[in-house]
C-alpha cells in the first residue's frame, strides 16, 4: 500500500466515524436551572408525553436521571388531579 492510499483510507474512516457519532442531548431542566419540576406546569409536561399519553423515556428526551424521576412523578401527580389525561381518546 502506498502512503496516498493509507491517507485516503484513514480520512474515509474518520469521516465515517463523524457521521455515526450522535450528539449528546443536554437535560433541558439543567440548562434552564430548574431545581424542581412543578406538576401544575402542564404546558411543559405535555412536551414529555407521547400522543398516546405515555411518558417519553430518558434516552429520547435527554433528561438527566434526577430530572427524569421528578418529571415522572410530576406527570403522574398531574394525571391524578386530572390536569393531564391517562390516555387519549
From Swiss-Prot:
One of its GO terms (cellular component) is cytosolic small ribosomal subunit. Residues 1-15 have a biased composition (Low complexity). This is Small ribosomal subunit protein bS18. One of its GO terms (molecular function) is small ribosomal subunit rRNA binding. It comes from Caldanaerobacter subterraneus subsp. tengcongensis (strain DSM 15242 / JCM 11007 / NBRC 100824 / MB4) (Thermoanaerobacter tengcongensis). Part of the 30S ribosomal subunit. Forms a tight heterodimer with protein bS6. Residues 1-22 are annotated as: Disordered. Belongs to the bacterial ribosomal protein bS18 family. Binds as a heterodimer with protein bS6 to the central domain of the 16S rRNA, where it helps stabilize the platform of the 30S subunit. Pfam families: Ribosomal_S18. The lineage of its organism: Bacteria, Bacillati, Bacillota, Clostridia, Thermoanaerobacterales. Keywords: Ribonucleoprotein, Ribosomal protein, RNA-binding, rRNA-binding. Gene3D superfamilies: Ribosomal protein S18. The keyword Ribonucleoprotein applies. The gene is rpsR. GO terms for biological process: translation. InterPro entries: Ribosomal_bS18, Ribosomal_bS18_CS, Ribosomal_bS18_sf.
Amino acid at each position: 500500500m502506498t502512503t496516498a492510499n493509507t491517507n485516503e483510507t484513514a480520512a474515509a474512516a474518520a469521516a465515517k466515524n463523524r457521521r455515526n457519532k450522535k450528539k449528546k442531548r443536554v437535560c433541558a431542566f439543567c440548562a434552564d436551572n430548574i431545581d424542581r419540576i412543578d406538576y401544575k406546569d402542564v404546558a411543559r409536561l405535555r412536551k414529555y408525553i407521547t400522543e398516546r399519553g405515555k411518558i417519553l423515556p430518558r434516552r429520547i428526551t435527554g433528561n438527566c436521571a434526577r430530572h427524569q424521576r421528578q418529571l415522572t412523578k410530576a406527570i403522574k401527580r398531574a394525571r391524578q388531579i386530572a390536569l393531564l389525561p391517562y390516555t387519549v381518546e
